[in-house]
């Protein structure tokens, strides 16, 4: 296990390993997305209150869930970068930030679209929505910081600190509907107790969440590989690996 973790810190080994992983994971991701989308958007029954307008949850919920998970990845990479000074952690941080930002933006936009027929308005300064907007700003802040510094080491340290400080927002997002009066409904999926959503709607939602996790992983790996290509474009190991492929 420790040998594998140590290998992940090696750019040449990671580049080769990630290429193989992407080739396997990409068709799985596409299949899961297609099956989940067809199941949720076309096969699942309409909601007895919201009709077909609820179907946007098959995009909204997976995007929101994986956006939060992506922040954990970025913050963990930031901690590794600060403590052990591992360069691949910096690459992970930089690659995760734009992916997380896009997912958060998708969650906010689809939430607004869903909110119009449900709440009668596109936007309210609800605790859950506001904390998700802060999450978007945190992701964009990391992207901007990496671009603002000429010194990559200084940029990575600044981004790591911002990522770790931003972790305080994550429990606020999770618990906002419990801590404050909120228009946003409580969690529909529960691991303890009965879920608030019927199984005919729940199963395609779970499948879409898995599909979005796979999509995040593939996109993250591709971003990391692109960063390695740019950073090590003159390195012999990269030319050899690209030539062999």
Annotated model-derived regions:
Residues 1-245:
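Polytopic transmembrane helical bundles with strong interfacial aromatic enrichment
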């Amino acid at each position: 296990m420790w040998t594998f973790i140590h290998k992940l810190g090696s750019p040449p080994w990671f580049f080769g390993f990630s290429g193989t992983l992407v080739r396997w994971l990409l068709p799985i991701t596409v299949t899961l997305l297609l099956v989940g989308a067809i199941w949720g958007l076309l096969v699942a029954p309409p909601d007895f209150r919201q009709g077909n307008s609820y179907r946007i949850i098959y995009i909204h919920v997976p995007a929101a869930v994986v956006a939060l998970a992506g922040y954990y990845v970025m913050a963990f990479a930031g901690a590794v970068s600060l403590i052990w000074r591992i360069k691949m952690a910096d690459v992970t941080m930089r690659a995760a930030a734009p992916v997380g930002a896009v997912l958060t933006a998708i969650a906010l936009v689809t939430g607004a679209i869903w909110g119009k027929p449900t709440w009668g308005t596109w936007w309210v300064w609800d605790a859950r929505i506001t904390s998700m907007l802060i999450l978007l700003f945190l992701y964009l802040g990391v992207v901007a910081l990496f671009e603002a510094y000429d010194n990559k080491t200084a940029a990575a340290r600044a981004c790591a600190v911002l990522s770790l400080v931003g972790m305080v927002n994550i429990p606020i997002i999770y618990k906002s509907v419990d801590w404050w009066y909120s228009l946003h409904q409580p969690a529909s999926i529960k691991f303890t107790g009965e879920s608030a959503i019927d199984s005919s709607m729940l199963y395609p939602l779970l499948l879409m969440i898995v599909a979005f996790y796979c999509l995040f992983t593939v996109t993250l790996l591709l971003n990391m590989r692109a960063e390695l290509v740019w950073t090590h474009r003159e390195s012999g190991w990269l030319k050899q690996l690209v030539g062999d492929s």
